Amino acid sequence: DWGAPVVWSIASHHPTRCHAVANLCVPYATLERGYEACLPLLDRSVYPEDEYPFGQWDYQVFYEEDFARAIQPMDANPTNAIKVVSRKGMPEMRGKVWRTATIRRDGGWFGGAAEAPELPLDAVVLSEADLSVFVAALTRNGFFGPCSWYMNHERNAEYSAQAVNGGRLDMPVLFLIGQYDYTCECVDSALAEPMRALCSKLTERTVTSGHWMAQEKPVEVNAAILHWLATAVSDIWPLPTAAA
């Protein structure tokens, strides 16, 4: 999620510090350049411009337009908010309008409700123990900090423009696509094309998951990373064992 633009920014601004880079769901040269950089890459067969000008990034515009209202229903009930958001991938939604594309039209998150609705825990993505940790942290600190990522697009774009080597990444790069990730939709749209143009040693793999890939399919994610390390980064992995 928002960790991905941070990782991409480290690699693009400090390539001599990065032997290789692996990332999930959010492709390079997209959100770290601001959501406006993603708009030309939308699948307009799903999101006609006259009806969905911001496509599935509509929710990010909502944060900019009314930040306090965007976080209010999450702060009102962190438990429900986390359970609503933390859901496994939905194969049946491919090619359909995703819920994040209508947030402003719907009057805000959760249809403009004062708080998130009650849903059963999706144990495929989140355990009761994990839920308790997240709820405790967000009850204590609120959603202001995490959601403030959405208020920094302009500065992120300015920083991204300072990347060295024109933003090219020449180290080995692994990118894992979520087949059912309809926020960072890379299967049918052009969202990953800038990454493909800028990464000279790119490996892509598709995982049958939604947006919360690492939680939903941890075995598949770890297997993909290990295989890539052993094949694309074999000069440093595995580390040589010390002589007895």
Task: Locate predicted features.
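Catalytic active-site module of serine/aspartate enzymes centered on a nucleophile-bearing elbow/loop
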Residues: 199-244
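Flexible "cap/lid" subdomain of the alpha/beta-hydrolase fold that forms the substrate-access gate
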Residues: 4-202
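Catalytic nucleophile serine of serine hydrolases
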Residues: 1
